[in-house]
Amino acid sequence: MPADIRADSEPGPRLPRRVRIGYGLGSLCTGTFATVPGLILLYYLTNVLAVPAAVAGAAVFLPKAWDVLVNPLVGAVSDRSRLRGGPRRPFLLIGACTLPPLFALIFAAPPLRGAAAAGYVAVLFLLAATAYAVFQVPYVTMPAEMTEDPAERGRILGWRVGFLGVAILLSGALAPAIAHADGDSPASYRTMGIAVAVLLALGMFGAWFTTRWAPAVARSEAEPSLRAQLAAARSHRPFLFLAGMWTLQALAIGVMLAGVQYFATYTLGSPAAVTPLFACLIGPLVLVMPLWNRLARLRGVKGAQWCASLLFLAGAVLLAFTPAGGPALGYAAVVLIGVAYAGLQLLPLTMLADTLAADVARTGKRRAATFTGLWTAAETLAFALGAGVFALVLAVTGFRSSDADHRVAQPEAALTGITMGMSVLPAVLAGASLWLLHRYREDRIGSVSPESEPPESVPQPSAMPPQPVPQQEETDRVD
């Protein structure tokens, strides 16, 4: 399938509305888990549990880095699964039963401080990240297996991104508000953990239940090992460039996400400022999403991605002038970043879904979960590394950790580091991603004859007839 959404595309059969909406509910989980740990956890460790910045960064980074190994394995296991209920939905249920309680326990730490507190949080966070991988990898795979029509995949992803915006807005605004309600006390963080766990459960169980009515028009074929999965990715250059571009942009977003609470507290002068900052970031997500979708249809997804990436870079640079221009300038810069962020949430996923379809046509293999497992592993590592990178900025600039009962003044170097880490560093990362976006070319479909049958290695579920290879379509060739 072409990576740009053309207005003259041949329409395919639509999925039931309840399936599209129900699938989107899963983003209440993915959006919340991608937001709250990155937003809250580092600050919780350094400003509530008195964990030194470098140690706190390791406690946040290492459990998420574990997902780099877990995600591809989950994808391979899911691909081979013959569980009752299909290859994907049972994993959604397992994740739904385990992630919410584990998340609540992260913020229910016993009265520990320093390295001991960091160890407790790291272990619980590692278990929670594993449970999240069990849910997320099959969840991200499902659109490519529900339909082979790119327009219908766009509609599915539209619901997903819409609920993603709701999840980020709710969790990003409510989690800090609850955590700060009692002066950053451990009790307020425990309450926050329970509230977020309820939101996670709502989205995860909702997606599991409603996708029972989803058709299965395709089935992925797993690569036999992690090495084989990486080899498959190396053989598909469009996927490599696309995944690399998104990894750098996710790292930039992860750095910003880790720094926003510090930016609110020390640059804007109020911990509560994180709530209006999130309103400025996520408000545009819902409002401008149709505009990004329209731009993708008119100019192609890659052209729209260029616009979103450049706008994100400009907003990040503008944010660096907040100390001189005042809070109003900072909020305006975050609005620009929010408009760009809406595009960055939609467009790479659309390109990924169509790139997976192109891989089927070229190779005759259905490896959606293999590629999405690698994609989510890279994304997870990027967001985790974002918190670690910002923690390193704090450590290098002399940030002083404290507990909830004893606040300390920060040196001027640390205050400057917070502002630069929130603005200049993400801008540099976004700029580097533009080279990979430039190298990306929409894949050409045509190496597999449309009349040919799928290779014997493609598994055919007993409940489904053999699936034909998608028809040839013309797009640009990789350089």
Regions found by a protein language model. Give the residues of each.
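Membrane-embedded alpha-helical bundles of multi-pass transporters/translocases
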Residues: 2-451, 476-479
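Intrinsically disordered, low-complexity repeat/linker tracts enriched for polar/charged residues
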Residues: 450-451, 455-456, 460-461, 465-466, ...
